[in-house]
UniProtKB/Swiss-Prot annotation:
Gene: SLC16A13
Name of this chain's protein: Monocarboxylate transporter 13
UniProt main location, coarse: Golgi
Cytoplasmic side, ranges: 1-10, 395-426
TM annotation in the entry: 11-31, 52-72, 83-103, 106-126, 139-159, 172-192, 221-241, 244-264, 283-303, 306-326, 338-358, 374-394
Annotated source species: Bos taurus (Bovine)
A Pfam family reported for this protein in Swiss-Prot or TrEMBL: MFS_1
Role played: Proton-linked monocarboxylate transporter. May catalyze the transport of monocarboxylates across the plasma membrane.
């Protein structure tokens, strides 16, 4: 396959964006909406809610910790077979879950098997997308990740309708069929060879190189800190509002407000990430700082107007930081190592995601309210912002019209003049 000097910034890349849109919807849209099965599982197996909640927790943990496996397979064989295999595993897990007779079966089928399938789909797809775009990378990421928000609106009522008409076993069969569309998403991931790709060295050599790369390690620490506080409103905002005397329906509706703002923020940030000159890390630091401040202000707001305004602002800024967070990594490690780099980041930052909600709940139990929970969550994001400013070129303003990836492109396009014939002759 011929090597391209730079990403095409379009062409088949838009089909990869389409694939990533549906893939993000079929992975995280399903995960976000899977709570509608929660009550059905509790009633069917007569198990406590705590044990049932482990189904989704295992699936998320396997998806995140298994990301390096998906990255390694994509580096070795390409993203297409990795994602298509992941789609088959996801559908098979949901299919087997429909025959479950105990929670252990659901742990193994949905948690382990479908979780493994999700691990093989999400990271390779976004990494492939990063290789197709350079100057429009942030916009492409923003458009692709809107699939999460849109599917969160659609899947929850859809799954409830399926439960009402086909019971939970029939609904899981149909979710299995829906998940098979991940195979089609994988088929759209056409391999792309770039001049920046490593000539030698497999996934192991790339991982070793990344673990010795200071900026990559600092970026991973920053995202882990951000991830620790990022999801707190989605987990505890409704409970916080109930403590303030809100009814359940308006409290839940506020999350829908955040989801709408999230969609707008992702697209707007994607456009700004490509339009504003300089490293994308600056924009990521801005959105992260604003999100941290908003979280810390939640305990101060008690009036409904203030809470609605804060939630709209949180949805926008938290959605805005997502596409630029994925766009910073190619600037740090290059597109040649993006598969392994993104897999490692996903694995490490999952530690923050797993610890954030339990820590927030612990602070609620100790203090009796969610004041400390939101303040500490905001502090984690502000700490992540502090780490981001240590990244290379963050304070470099000498060439405000060029982005780091543009400098790489210019270097690749530079033509060195060859000596003319007869040079040196008398």
């Amino acid at each position: 396959m011929a090597y391209r000097a730079e990403p095409p910034d379009g062409g088949w890349g838009w089909m990869v964006v389409l694939s990533a849109f549906f893939q993000s919807a079929l992975v995280f849209g399903v995960l976000r909406s899977f709570g509608v099965f929660f009550v059905e599982f509790v009633a069917a197996f007569e198990e406590p809610a705590a044990r049932v909640s482990w189904i989704a927790s295992i699936g998320i943990a396997v998806q995140q910790f298994g990301s390096p496996v998906g990255s390694a397979l994509s580096t070795k064989f390409g993203p297409r077979p990795a994602v298509m295999t992941g789609g088959i595993l996801t559908a098979l897990g949901m299919l087997l879950a429909s025959f479950a007779t105990s929670l252990t079966h659901l742990y193994l089928s949905i948690g382990l098997l479908s979780g493994s399938g999700w691990a093989l789909t999400f990271t390779p797809t976004l990494a492939c997308l990063s290789r197709y775009f350079s100057r429009r990378r942030s916009l492409a990421m923003g458009l692709a990740l809107t699939g999460v928000g849109l599917s969160s609106f659609a899947f929850a009522p859809l799954f409830q309708w399926l439960l009402n008409h086909y019971a939970w076993r029939g609904a899981l069969l149909l979710v299995s069929a829906l998940s098979l569309h991940l195979v089609a998403c994988g088929a759209l991931l056409r391999p792309l060879s770039l001049a920046e790709d490593p000539v030698v060295g497999g996934p192991g050599a790339q991982i070793t190189s990344l673990l010795r790369h200071g900026p990559f390690l600092r970026y991973t620490v920053a995202l882990t800190l951000i991830n620790t506080g990022y999801f707190i409103p989605y987990v505890h905002l409704v409970a916080h509002l109930r403590d303030l005397g809100w009814d359940p329906l308006p409290a839940a509706f506020l999350l829908s407000v955040a989801a709408i703002s999230d969609l707008v923020g992702r697209v707007a940030s994607g456009w700004l990430g490509d339009a504003v000159p300089g490293p994308v890390a600056r924009l990521l630091m801005l959105w992260t700082t604003l999100t941290g401040v908003i979280l810390a202000l939640y305990p101060v707001a008690e009036a409904p107007t203030g809470l609605v305004a804060l939630t709209m602002a949180y949805g926008f800024t938290s959605g805005a930081l997502t596409p630029v967070a994925f766009s910073v990594l190619p600037e740090l490690v290059g597109t040649g190592k993006i598969y392994c780099g993104l897999g490692l980041v996903q694995m490490v930052e999952s530690i923050g995601g797993l610890l954030g909600a339990p820590l927030s709940g612990y602070l609620r139990d100790v203090t009796g309210n969610y004041t400390a929970s939101f303040v500490v969550a905001g502090a984690f994001l502000l700490a992540g912002s502090g780490v981001l400013i240590t990244l290379p070129h963050f304070f470099c303003f000498s060439a405000p019209t060029s982005k780091p990836q543009d400098l790489v492109t210019e270097a690749l396009d530079t033509k060195v003049p060859l000596p003319e014939e007869g040079l040196g002759e008398d």
